[in-house]
């Protein structure tokens, strides 16, 4: 999935940041990386059709497409700080992405990926009804 969907730098950096939040401990490496793939696609401004395709694919595999599916319906300010300290730290792989990486930009990309996931799940439920 990762090689086709986005660079693995952002995906694994997001995973590493998520591991700083104890509430994500029950979730597997691949589940956290899946959400990182979505964040990486948003960071890289992937075409809309590619985003839809990856959301469908991850959902079909029962992988998380929202933060809530990773046990994070909301994050505290401290959780965001811990996550971003790791995901955007000076030695983080995310700096291999082809754009300037900022903590605010990564947070916004994660929030957008989460919002898109919620919208996707809402529209998927409607089409199954």
Language-model region placement:
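Active-site segments that bind and position negatively charged phosphate/pyrophosphate groups
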Residues: 1-63, 68-69
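C-terminal charged capping/lid subdomain of soluble metabolic enzymes
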Residues: 46-129
